[in-house]
Amino acid sequence: MSQWQNICKIDDILPGTGVCALSGGEQVAIFRPYHSDQVFAISNIDPFFEASVLSRGLIAEHQGELWVASPLKKQRFRLSDGLCMEDEQFSVKHYDARVKDGVVQLRG
């Protein structure tokens, strides 16, 4: 079973934004959509352009699903599993994320 890795304090991520962190040599985009301890983590790499930009995307909710729009061409990636909502042939890696004692953790 994989261990949980401490990444940052939850207060380091403003509600409605994302940040990029390095975990196991991979860039991970961590999102805090609301003013709560709920966090999501997906790869920071936009698969259409191979650019490290997803943590700077816009977070939105549509039909009950949270997603982030890439800042480049606005393709949307579902935060729950990394699936591209415009083209299901594309997806980004999803990471298990949680907040424990005020610290954001990723399973790795």
From Swiss-Prot:
BP term (GO), one: nitrate assimilation
Protein name, entry field: Nitrite reductase (NADH) small subunit
CC terms in the record's Gene Ontology section: cytoplasm; nitrite reductase complex [NAD(P)H]
InterPro entries assigned: NirD (IPR017881), Rieske-like_NirD (IPR012748), Rieske_2Fe-2S_sf (IPR036922)
Encoding gene per record: nirD
Gene Ontology molecular functions: 2 iron, 2 sulfur cluster binding; nitrite reductase NADH activity
Protein purpose: Required for activity of the reductase.
Species per Swiss-Prot/TrEMBL record: Salmonella typhimurium (strain LT2 / SGSC1412 / ATCC 700720)
Keyword Cytoplasm: yes
Coiled-coil boundaries: none
Chief location category: cytoplasm
Taxonomic superkingdom: Bacteria
Keyword NAD recorded: yes
